[in-house]
Amino acid sequence: MEYAPGRSIDLYGAPSDPTVLLWHGTQTDARHTVRALATLLADRGLSVAVPDWDSHSDDRGRSDLLASVDYARSWSQNPDGLVLAGWSLGGVAAAGLTVDAADHGLVLAHTVCLAGAFMVLDPISGTDVTDRLGGSRAASPFTLLHGSADDVVPVAASRSFSHSLAAAGWDVRLLELDADHGNIAGARYVESADRYEPADDPDTKRVAGVVAGHIATAAGVTQAG
């Protein structure tokens, strides 16, 4: 399935279910890395759209990310109930789009950031999300999930961003999990390939299950998966 010419997207569940748009991180066209998490979300009664996007393109992935939002909204039967979730750099993009949602004519139900790399620039706007909070209008709530064992993006990044969101009037919840940078998204880092891949080891399954539960709660789905 393509959300734009040459740009692939995986769809899980039924569009009548609450919809989560899930963005992977910096790794180019890496929708497969969050496959396990997307499957767990679908098992919990959610529909999930997972696009490829290219953070190394000339526009930092902006056109990919915005086109995927349009596609997910057109696919979902409740486009204004969209939950936006992103991992690492994808989490920064999700936060940036949420802060600027009104400028894009968007209504989001909730935003979930997994190990958000908030110390780097938002790939959509090319600016620091935190610097834009002062002029933003608080809207949809945030859930920030970060692993205490993350040695790629320190948990301090989410702590600081959570504080900034709250100071600007946004509804935010920060949860620090027993997780690392990969398994919080159902993935693991393969050193020999210098890339993340989906993982199915018991610890990753446990962490991804916890994360899926929090995303489901953000989407208003509370039954066990």
What are the functions of these language-model segments?
Residues S57-S76:
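Alpha/beta-hydrolase active-site loop
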Residues M1-P15:
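N-terminal cap/lid segment of alpha/beta-hydrolase-fold proteins
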Residues D70-R132:
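Primarily recognizes the serine-hydrolase "nucleophile elbow" in alpha/beta-hydrolase
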Residues A168-G225:
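C-terminal catalytic histidine-bearing segment of alpha/beta-hydrolase fold enzymes
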Residues D17-G25:
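Short beta-strand element of the alpha/beta-hydrolase
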Residues A115-A168:
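The feature captures the conserved acid-bearing segment of alpha/beta-hydrolase catalytic domains
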Residues Q27-A38, W53, A156:
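The serine-hydrolase catalytic nucleophile loop
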Residues A42-S57:
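Conserved alpha/beta-hydrolase
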